[in-house]
Amino acid sequence: MRIYENPKSTSENRLNARSWYIPEGSCKQIMLNGEWRFAFFENGDRAGNIEEWETIEVPSCWQLKGYENPNYTNINYPFPCDPPYVPDINPTGVYERSFQIEDGSLKTYFVFEGVSSEAELYINGKYVGRTQGSRLTAEFDITEFVSSGTNTARVYVRKWCCGSYLEDQDAFRYNGIFRDVYVLSRPHGHIFDIDIKTEENDIICTADAEFSAELYDGDALLERRDSVGGKAVFTVNEPSLWTAETPYLYTVKLYAAGEIITRKIGFRTIKISSDYELLINGTPVKLKGVNHHDTDPYKGWTMSEEDYVRDLKLMKELNINTVRTSHYPPAPKFLDYCDEMGFYVILECDIETHGFVRRYADIGYKFDTENGDWPCVEEMWKKEFLDRIERTYERDKIHTSVIMWSTGNESAYGVNQAAQIDWLKSRDKVRLAHCEDASRAGSQEKPTYFQ
């Protein structure tokens, strides 16, 4: 078994997931979007010395840049279904570019917001780490690999890996570095992870380092506080409430180590009534929703902020109030716009294993986990199921628009989704959790929605 075919080892040296933010102040963000050197290999095992480079735009999908053709499939995998193995002939794109570091003594991080399907990162010729999970943010500490001045990043991107068995979404299949990629140079002692929640009239801010905080209502400063034990609480008398129709947000700024982290938060409650009504702020709400794919006829999975705003404005014109991010997390900015423009979001984990219904075609179109080795019931996939839901939750846990987590799409239902639900409910006592296939995978004792 090759390392990229092992579901129990789908990353090396990738940092734990955290809330998404771009610090201001002393942090330096070095955007690596733009032209990269590029070499394409039909067989990635032969991706050795590269004497002649071509160039490619990043972010992009290489199938739309002249390397291979776009491939659409709904149910079937684009390769023989023999989990966790992928074809020996595994195309690979090699990306390389240089970047400047002003101060090599700072903490330095390399961030992928989306790369498909597996990426190996090298800095200045030294191996840093690898990651799977195409639509999930991956961050690496490269402090020990860089120095002041010119540095070089090289990324090997495999077309397929064991994680491809969990990414059988009904869509065109693409590969490459298809979302933003950048370097963050940050001061020592900086905040890494933050969380901001509301409880009744309180806004509760927590972080893994001490900080000062400010709360704003529009441009008006309401209050300043210093954290105690990494926690600061603001009380807002008679707060304005957030709904999809009235998306009222307050602004929180956290100050630490010369950095400023700015996030927005709204007051809203989520309940299921005794009559099984969805209540937002105590009022019954009917979800009028759509599935939204990250897809563009010319750019594939690469979506700009303008693309997202265009789609959301169209939804507003059509009186849509809910978005299911089918079937994976979108780029982070999409959820900022959902917060600001007013949408209820069902945020879906990057998991779909639909192709297993064809592996057991004699059973027919049903998700029969008792007569097949579906990933949802196989122990070897449990770590990856949990890793993907953890990364989904941790990145987007602050967003007010997110009212429900989804464990994935068309993947049957088994112990691995149950483990995902248990993990979610241990971390989030407010939002709903959802498994799309639970009700049709067998017993009605397996509910589709979990409170």
Per-range role (PLM):
Residues 1-23, 37-41, 65, 85-190, ...:
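Accessory beta-strand-rich segments of carbohydrate-active enzymes
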Residues 87-94, 246-248, 300-332:
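Aromatic- and glycine-enriched glycan-recognition loops and surfaces
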Residues 129-131, 225-226, 263, 288, ...:
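Short hydrophobic alpha-helix segments
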Residues 187-210:
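Surface beta-strand/loop "capping" patches
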Residues 191-197, 241, 253-315, 336:
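N-terminal carbohydrate-binding accessory modules
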